[in-house]
Amino acid sequence: MSKEITSAGLRRINIIAGVFHLLQMAAVLALSSDFTLPITATYMAGPPGSTFASPIVLFKTPVGLTVAIFLGLSALAHFIVASPKFFGRYIAGLDAKRNYFRWVEYSISSSVMIVLISQITGVSEIGSIISIFGVNAAM
């Protein structure tokens, strides 16, 4: 027989999960290297229809920091739903079988992770990166 989860229990679970994510974020920051992945742009080298210049690196994504941001966003979401200001709205949504807070958090954090995964697999062009983030967030 399973124990029923109460509102107070759910608040406690969210706080514990938030602390866990913060600890994971700190561990990732402490253990990560300075490995980065490039974000590039390609510009035309001449009139329309001609060739493109070689891609240039706009900036580099620090992988460890990006993973830490992903974990930090999740921790922040747990603390927000456990906060006095939003907990009532969170519980009302769950009672109505809706979890708006989690969907908003997932749309952002999963987009960060999907962009990082796409970079690891070789996607580096800024237009593609922005599109991937936007499409994923919109789902």
Residue ranges and their predicted role:
Residues 55-59, 114-130:
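Helix-coil boundary and interhelical linker segments in multi-pass alpha-helical membrane proteins
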Residues 20, 135-136:
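Transmembrane alpha-helical core residues of multi-pass small-molecule transporters
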Residues 2-94, 100-106:
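N-terminal topogenic module of multi-pass integral membrane proteins
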Residues 105-119, 134:
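Internal, conserved structured core segments that host functional sites
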Residues 68-69, 125-135:
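Structural signature of hydrophobic alpha-helical transmembrane segments
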